[in-house]
Amino acid sequence: MDRFYIIPNSAKDPELAFSGMIIAYLEQRGARCHVQPITEKMEGPYHYTDPDGIPEDTQCIIVLGGDGTLLQAARDVVHRDIPLIGINLGTLGFLAEVDKNSVYPALDRLLSDDYEVEERMMLEGKIYHGNDLIGKDIALNDIVIGREGHLRVIR
């Protein structure tokens, strides 16, 4: 694997210093990298990444941030069928499994095709009011149904 697209989290890598280190590391080893431009807020249905901006030959998307960044990126690029790997720049990550201190061995494994792709389930949830569809969205792994309204305490 040698063609990567990088999605940074501007709150966790504001100067793109960590992103730059990853790009330099990969490019020094012959890989090609493209970086998602950082914008205030994306227009339309995408929050981090417009999938149309990802080069067609991309083999892997590297998501820098945490679980939230990875979850949103998965939603944004769901129709592109490109594997994602999350690099955790925070304190604890369950989905973003690669810790920032062990990023280089993980990148080496990607470059040498020493990895397994783990398939994850994408779900679509729809909200109806009567027969009217009032909302829908997609999610990675699970959808939580909650109740909105007044908090009631029972004695």
Model-flagged regions — what are they?
Residues 94-155:
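Catalytic core of DAGKc-family lipid kinases
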Residues 29-33, 57-60, 87-89, 109-112, ...:
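Glycine-rich loops and low-complexity Gly/Arg-rich segments
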Residues 1-5, 86-89, 95-102:
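Short, charged N-terminal helix-start/capping segments
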Residues 49, 89-90, 138-140:
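Residue-level signal for pocket-adjacent positions within structured domains
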Residues 72, 77-94:
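Gly/Ser-rich helix-loop-strand patches that form or flank binding pockets
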Residues 1-65, 69-79:
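N-terminal glycine-/serine-/threonine-rich phosphate-binding loop
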Residues 10-11, 89, 99, 144:
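Short, glycine/serine-rich, charged loops/turns that create anion-binding
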